[in-house]
Amino acid sequence: MLDVESAKEILSTAQGSISKEHYVKDKDLFYIIFTSGSTGKPKGVCITYNNLNNFLHWYTGYYDEKEELVFLGHPPFSFDLSVMSLWPSIYLGASLVQIDKKHQENFKLMFEELNKSNATIWISTPSFIEMCFIDKNFNQSLMPKVKQFVFCGEKLFSTTVAKIHENFGDAQVINTYGPTESTVMVTWVEITKELNAKYYENLPVGEVKWGTKVHLADPDEEGKGEIVITGNTVAKGYFKNDAITNEKFGLGEIDGKEERSYLTGDLGYFKDGMLFCEGRIDFQVKLHGHRIELEDIDNNLLKNKKIRQAATVPSYEEGKVKSLVSFVIYNQEIEKRFEVTKQIKQELKKLVPEYMIPKKIVFLDEMPLNNNGKIDKKKLKELV
């Protein structure tokens, strides 16, 4: 093991022997993260040194370098959410505790690790923390030093925020938004109790970072359109895939300076100076002539206090959407599923039109999660 002085000596020797022409340059490729898409074939997103540097300058500005920071991450390093814990911890000289898959699959082991972690900054998908809330021991007593929960990668629901406020005292809840193609995230907002109550239906993802501009392409009469990101964290494109790069990426302008742009495929709108995201445009389905946002159904199902988690998927027949199926985790023992299903549908009918009521409700003990900690929609579709 090297001590600090030995490491400094090695670094100074190495630095002196390398010509400046070999230093990493702003536009040099720094890392590639593969992301799946509608085609099912992963695409390698090319992030430059400049992309990451600009992200870090902005993101780490929310923290005090003098504080003893311990980032806690759960996603594998192949998932872009890990960028929010790995690189900031190095940049700030902070610590990083990584919960590996083996521990995630065993609550006893995972909770032991969480308790020992001394984590101050929690970073995860909303689905991952919902999984943790299955155990009543998941609270401030387990992690007394945690002061901030940061979420990205999925829609954050008000019910999840309320659980955190209830179980973790004064800890901040931060909602963010951004695709892999723009170096993880480009927005930030603290969801206070007041904000959570005000925007219960759809929480804001926050104000847009400096060096970035967001506009909405082809907005409808309500001002909702596809989110387009222009700025200094937008990637070079997809690795060895010029066709899709040219389709999704382009050039924009910020303060007279040319910057990369990216078409996200996400539906959004602005309100009160903040960006709101309504999910993937391709998560919308058309059923009997009605266009339906599936996450809207989930959001309304969660207004039922007996439902802890919900995820709705379409059921297809001959390539067309024939009905909707909602998977739910129920908070109580179920004796008569037919009666409970009927009650859930009756409650939902008070909130949404008839055409948005799922034909079938499936009860699960827990939601299947993919390797990135998100609800595995493909697995749910297989269960339909």
Label each residue range with its predicted role:
Residues 1, 94-117, 123-131, 155-156, ...:
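ATP-dependent adenylate-forming carboxylate-activation enzymes
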Residues 1-22, 52, 172-175, 190-384:
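AMP-dependent adenylate-forming
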Residues 17-34, 65-71, 77:
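Conserved pre-ATP/AMP-binding loop-to-beta segment of ANL
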Residues 30, 46, 70-72, 78, ...:
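Short, well-ordered beta-strand segments
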Residues 32-45:
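Conserved adenylation A10 loop of the ANL superfamily
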Residues 38, 93, 153, 231, ...:
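Conserved G/P- and acidic residue-centered "switch" motifs that form tight phosphate/ATP-binding loops
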Residues 43-72, 80-120:
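Conserved AMP-binding/adenylation subdomain of ANL enzymes
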Residues 91-94, 119-123, 133-200, 204:
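Gly/Ser/Thr-rich phosphate-binding loop
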